[in-house]
């Protein structure tokens, strides 16, 4: 299990980098040059919602990128709209602009193409469900380790 555990960690990291490269290629093929792959993933995670930068940070993994910086760049390039909360002036909420919604649709079509290709026998739906379940357990384990400290050993997985 030692080798498998370390291999999974390395695989998750490689998959994330490869997927970001796929997003970059998609942006290039669409002629979109004013947003990078990480920003496009942040944009995709916003979708049709409105949220704070803090909420956005919790929703996705952006390889240690500065989400606030990326939000600022997307604002400058017209992909998002930023509004102060009427209840708490310190809180800023973001949502996609029309330009952002257009790119979101392009990203959604990319995901749909990928799913169609995968369904041709590359990966079965049950395989994705099983991988998702296992990765969620790892996520809960690592979250527990962070919350309890690096030496935390007692962990009871949720079903």
Residue ranges and their predicted role:
Residues 53, 71-72:
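Short, hydrophobic-biased segments on the C-terminal half of alpha helices
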Residues 22-65:
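N-terminal helix-turn-helix DNA-binding core of bacterial DNA-binding proteins
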Residues 72-130:
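Charged, amphipathic alpha-helical coiled-coil/dimerization segments
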Residues 6-9, 13, 17, 61, ...:
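Short amphipathic alpha-helical segments with heptad-repeat character
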Residues 1-33:
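N-terminal leader segment of winged-helix/HTH proteins
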Residues 16, 50, 104, 139-143:
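A structural signal for well-ordered alpha-helices, especially hydrophobic packing surfaces
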Residues 1, 125-159:
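C-terminal regulatory/oligomerization modules of transcriptional regulators
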């Amino acid at each position: 299990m030692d080798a498998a555990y370390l291999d999974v960690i390395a695989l998750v990291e490689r998959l994330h980098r490869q997927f970001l490269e796929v997003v970059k290629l998609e942006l290039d093929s669409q002629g979109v040059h004013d947003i990078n792959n990480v920003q496009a993933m942040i944009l995709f995670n916003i979708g049709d919602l409105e949220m704070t930068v803090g909420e956005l940070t919790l929703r996705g993994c952006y390889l240690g990128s500065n989400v606030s910086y990326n939000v600022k760049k997307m604002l400058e390039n017209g992909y998002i709209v930023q509004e102060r909360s009427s209840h708490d002036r310190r809180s800023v909420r973001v949502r996609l602009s029309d330009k952002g919604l257009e790119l979101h649709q392009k990203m959604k079509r990319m995901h749909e193409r990928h799913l169609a290709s995968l369904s041709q026998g590359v990966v079965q739906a049950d395989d994705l469900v099983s991988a998702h379940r296992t990765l969620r357990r790892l996520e809960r384990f690592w979250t527990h380790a962070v919350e309890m400290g690096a030496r935390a050993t007692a962990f009871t997985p949720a079903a």
